[in-house]
Amino acid sequence: LVREAVVTARVTTLKGPDAGAYYVDGPGRYYLDGDEPPGRWLGRGATSLGLVGEVDDDDFLSLMDGRHPATGELLGTSHHERTVRGFDVTCSAPKSVSVLFAIGDDRVRKEVLEAHDAAVAAAFGWIEDHAHCRYRVDGEVWTVDARGLIAAAFRQHTSRAHDPQLHTHLVIPNRVMAPDGRWLALDARTLKHDQRTISALYAAGLRAELTSRLGVRWNDVVNGQAETADAPDEVLDAFSQRTRQMARRLDEKTERFVDNLGRRPTPRERWRIEREAAIDSRPSKTSEDAQALHEHWTDQLDALGYRPDGYIDRVTGRARPIEPDAATAAYFLAAAALT
């Protein structure tokens, strides 16, 4: 089994009038349900509107509809049926980090969550500082630096197959504060273009935080991602049901492509097939009791011959001294500049 390790942050465009409702009323309701924490507001744009702390459903829906959450007034121009309502920047931890959280004791789980949240905040801070908004004058599109973004951060700790998968959805409504106080549309070209940079910032931040907090050491970085050193492949594979589902669907669709066209897909065609396989194999997300999941995951680990305490000692190296490195120092300097 080859686990997907291409990017740790993905940018998805959210379109249509139901884009916001998906997260709070529809299939995505699980973002605010069950044992997951409530969403939280991020960004200077959110602060300017008085949005601090937990995400309120009505405020979120108003913003995704391009309206002021308190007054209902339009922020900029009105949306239409095909208008881009926002963007979902999803920051996902490597599988080994998710497993460490899944089977860890209270202290380890707390440190992993705080490390993840800090890395997400640093990545979002970079997005906000480099964001642009766009406007049209006499048919010509102009861009200007943005003064502040709004983001609703929804953190989750499972995949749709109930594997441990720590990740955060940064849902950014398509309304950006311009330097003159107007609310304009986000220039998505820069957001999409910088996806790999955002990925690298989150991943490097997570590694630095976990090394500092728990003494975690890392394998070599491959495609922008690294697993924790000493994490057995058999353990990571056992907690990767979603990856297996996608791999089976990808094989089926690739075989059908070859049968129909008599050739292998080009890189661009394969990228499209991979996206289709991910969507086709995606089960509905349901809530599960956190304690029940934790017990299930520790039972899985035990069946593989590993005890949680021994596994944590093996992966975190908490009995070994932490050795600061240049990457860790550079991350903390960058994070400090964002606060």
Where are these regions (language model features)?
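Intrinsically disordered, flexible peripheral segments
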Residues: 1-338
